[in-house]
């Protein structure tokens, strides 16, 4: 029996029409076949024709570079060329078209992109590639350049990228660079780019409510540094700049000891008026301060950047290279690039977007080497060595300089102190402390550097004494002693208060904690930690004080706990480090974007 013919696939059963039917309803039921490789294959062939100079109908000239191409391809991909070749301009008929605004190599890259959809953006070419892509209206290339620049944002270049984005109408990149500068203000102001800004740009930056700063003193010191960079020209702008510094939010001691003594303030009657306003604010009862409304009494409201706690090296039980980070948001630890060499008992700071591991012990020698870690590149680099070998030292940042305080050189405890200038990559000595201090803890409050406790090898005693350094006078001064001797205490700063955590006095390892208030020059006890710790790392983040690792007198600890000053309680973090470590360097950084 013969099989009956099947009805056409595109028609309804019982209502067949001839193939040349004009009924549009038939087409609605026909599947459309799309070949995803067709366009790619076509452009590949067109590019091969171009490379052989076949069917080319125009030569694009830039400088001494001549590039053969097809008008229809250029017009299809670039609105710039579309307008050129379809309009009434003479170029629409010309065999050779010269483009003066773009260099030859850049133009070749962009025409290659038109045919291949491939382009490589690098640090070397992005500044010429982006404006050229803008000229040719190749928006995808321009977007790729902007994304590349966004990935390169760093405290040393974000202001330059912001200016570049503004010049070339890259609105999204401009906003992201501006936000980055606000979020990394404390490091940005240490850069050459900041010092070279114009007055309008400085005012715009420091007036932002979104600045992420630990204290308003960062803004004041930035203003002084900017003016002093070209003092003869810029000192006339002091009053205008100080209008945006929120002096009432600074501690009274800082106003008296630093702001009032600054020559640039003394020489300006308007600046003195702002200082008087700030002092009046401090004299008012708390309930009346809210009535004194001005832009300078308004708290800044920064966007909180995600934070990471970085734990570098340490003793586990020997000196190690391992570096791990704790993500506060994800509540987990992860490993990052190891130190170039083993290091424990080092000083640790975060400055200018970099983590610095200063001095320490490599398992056999006390060292004076310094390594810096770039979180964006996940890479360690060596910088200038200190002048002296130091382990169990304290390290802190004051007025843009990294200070290495005291320590042990292998034979004796040290009272000497040296400072590192990141711009010149040089170390220099400053005034020594009054007492030799190894296993010393340090912190900065109100523009002063504090050295807390430690061990004096001369007297062979753990210390309860504390002294502070004034960089303006280059002098160390004793302040109130702690209630107990502490060597190897963790020291941290939270809410303009100085905390001394744990430590030991001889064989006795402590869990007690005391806090110093510079306004009263007095120490007071707060809640004990959950466990005894000495040689632990301390850092403050999000209103909490974290204590990391250390040892309890018998073993190294992998645990972490934090102190909440509101509740006066310590809480153990559920996630521990991968290994117990004491004498590790600890600091908090902004999570790389």
UniProtKB/Swiss-Prot annotation:
SUPFAM superfamilies: Kelch motif, POZ domain. Keywords: Actin-binding, Cell projection, Cytoplasm, Cytoskeleton, Kelch repeat, Repeat, Ubl conjugation pathway. The keyword Cytoplasm applies. Residues 1-28 are annotated as: Disordered. Residues 56-123 form the BTB domain. Kelch repeats lie at residues 308-353, 354-400, 402-447, 449-496, 497-543, 545-591. InterPro entries: BACK, BTB-kelch_protein, BTB/POZ_dom, Kelch-typ_b-propeller, Kelch_1, KLHL2_BTB/POZ, SKP1/BTB/POZ_sf. Component of the BCR(KLHL2) E3 ubiquitin ligase complex, at least composed of CUL3 and KLHL2 and RBX1. Binds actin. Interacts with KLHL12. Interacts (via N-terminus) with FYN (via SH3 domain). PANTHER family: KELCH PROTEIN (PTHR24412), KELCH-LIKE PROTEIN 2 (PTHR24412:SF155). This is Kelch-like protein 2. It comes from Homo sapiens.
